[in-house]
A protein has these predicted regions:
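N-terminal accessory regions of nucleic-acid-interacting proteins
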Residues: 1-21, 90, 101, 154, ...
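Short active-site loop/helix that positions an aromatic residue
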Residues: 30-31, 83-90
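Acidic, Mg2+-coordinating catalytic module of metal-dependent nucleases/exonucleases
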Residues: 120-181
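Short alpha-helix plus adjacent loop in nuclease-associated cores
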Residues: 99-121, 145
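Short active-site oxyanion
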Residues: 70-75
């Protein structure tokens, strides 16, 4: 987990060296009408590492803003419009160079719109959603919360790479096979 501004900048520097990352956010749920909480957590994943930015602790999204506004790293996520809107409540951001998986997946004939369903369809495995409504502003995130949060961002990256036809980790190669559609992602990258 990334809990300080210095840690956030160090993580951002590393992430901006990646060609593509998965991204997601978590917000403390509100069970009362009219109450909205700010984004508490931003998850950004590479193939093997997921950074969990505790925005509710850092109180500054400048490092996240650098990543989102970068044109050198492709950001991949699902329902990014909602994630970006939540982050804009904290600071003005203009995201560049990203792919919305809901739109991208439709180019491959996938009609499912939830991350859990798209992932299960492609990989034959389920993503647990039991932590979705937990308190993301808690002083410490539980291991279950951290795993849930990291999995969502990581899954976005894996779905994108699988649809694009890029090599997957060994355990997925036998499960997923798709006709490759070279260059199709260019139509979906938001500048």
């Amino acid at each position: 987990t990334v809990n300080t501004e210095n840690e956030a900048y160090t993580a951002a520097e590393s992430l901006m060296n990646e060609t593509a990352v998965g991204i997601d956010t978590e917000t403390r749920p509100s069970f009362r009408k009219g109450i909205m909480h700010n984004v508490a957590l931003v998850q950004i994943s590479t193939w093997d590492t997921c950074y969990l930015f505790r925005i509710c602790r850092i109180n500054n999204i400048h490092a996240i803003k650098q990543i989102l506004e970068s044109t050198g790293t492709l950001k991949i996520g699902l329902s990014l419009k909602d994630d970006f809107a939540g982050l804009r409540r904290l600071s003005p951001i203009i995201p560049h160079h990203y792919i919305e998986l809901q739109q991208y997946a439709t180019a491959f004939g996938i009609e499912e719109m939830s991350l859990q369903k798209i992932y299960a369809l492609l990989f034959g495995r389920k993503i647990s959603k039991t932590q979705q409504l937990s308190n993301w502003e808690a002083p410490e995130l539980t291991n279950a919360q951290q795993l849930y949060a990291a999995t969502d961002a990581w899954a976005c990256l894996h779905i994108y790479k699988a649809l694009k036809g890029e090599p997957l980790p060994t355990e997925y190669r036998k499960i997923f096979q798709t006709p490759q559609q070279k260059g199709i992602e260019k139509r979906f990258i938001q500048k």
